[in-house]
UniProtKB/Swiss-Prot annotation:
Homodimer. Interacts with the major capsid protein. This is Head fiber dimeric protein. Forms short fibers at the surface of the viral capsid. Its main location: virion.
Length: 122
């Protein structure tokens, strides 16, 4: 559910579910701990939400085997966009292989190769 915070001539400023944001709206993301603090403002460009105030970087995991399951910050995905200083937690798993996991702090674009090894118990 989204809530309109302000109605302008060219766009609406809203907060809520990012999936509901249209091309003519600006999404305001508030801090969940500090009341009233805005941590990001985003707008949809070419179908994707991009930050207007914080620089974002791409964090990608390239798993071997290629069909391994990659989970980044709790979501099954091989790539995310995150702000500098953000901690990313990840895991790569596949039946018959030893799961690998870890965390990294974003400081720029990352393309991380993760190779799983066969589980000797399988």
């Amino acid at each position: 559910m989204k809530r309109v915070l302000n109605l302008g001539n060219l766009s609406r400023i809203v907060e809520g579910d990012p999936n509901e944001i249209t091309d003519d709206e600006i999404l305001v993301i508030k801090d969940k701990i500090i009341e009233g603090k805005i941590i990001d403002i985003q707008k949809r460009v070419d179908g994707k939400l991009v930050s207007l105030i914080t620089e974002k970087y791409t964090y990608t995991i390239n798993p071997t085997p290629a069909d391994a399951i990659v989970v980044i910050n709790g979501s099954t995905t091989k790539s995310i966009r995150a702000a500098k200083g953000h901690t990313v937690t990840w895991s790569v798993s596949k039946t018959g292989f030893v799961t690998q996991s870890g965390s990294d702090v974003i400081s720029g674009d990352v393309s991380k190769d993760v190779t799983l090894v066969a589980n000797p118990a399988s």
